[in-house]
Amino acid sequence: WIAKQALDLGAYGIVWPHISTVDQARNAVAACRYPRLKGKPLYEPAGIRGDGPTQAVRYWGITLQEYYERADVWPLAPHGEIFVVLMIEDTTGIANLDDMLKNVPGIGAVLIGEGDLSQELGYPRQYEHKAVLDAMAQIVATCKKHNVVVGHPHVEAANAERIIKEGYRYLMCAAPRSFATLEKARGLAGRS
């Protein structure tokens, strides 16, 4: 129900933490979708979001009917403007990621929760440790296989080039470091 509340206030997407199974991934996407009649186009995953987006309509600056037309998950619905991001933060999630991306339409991106992942691997916050980097590389490879954007949560000017070369396309950086990092990453990605 928390996804409904955030979306009803006008959020354009939800980042779902600790997604480790196909069922959890399906539920995450379903929570961001309105129900449809069985057999209708784009039925699966069946939506479970309740109605009531009056704040979202005002925030988005559109009519209620326009909101209903756009309030579906992209890329499942090409016209959809709701973005579903799954956080993979443990080895169970890594093991199940291929099945998630193969069987659950509507996942817009995968974000690696490297803090929790590094904890489970026994190297807390040692983001450059080989075991952590290897686990993250598995996630990147799986996302590339399914052409799903993969995100890195700790981009700095010092690691931006490596991260972009590794295939990350959704880059996050902390506010105090963001301007220099943003400019460097934009240049590396050819977006200056």
What positions do the PLM features span?
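Small/polar glycine-rich anion-binding or flexible loop at a beta-alpha turn
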Residues: 154-161
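Catalytic beta/alpha-barrel core
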Residues: 12-21, 85-89, 127-131, 149-154, ...
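Alpha-helix-loop-beta-strand connector modules within alpha/beta enzyme cores
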Residues: 31-42, 76-79, 128-151
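Glycine/Thr-rich beta-alpha phosphate-binding loop at enzyme active sites
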Residues: 112-133
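Glycine-rich phosphate-binding active-site loops on the catalytic face of alpha/beta enzymes
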Residues: 12-24, 110-119, 169-187
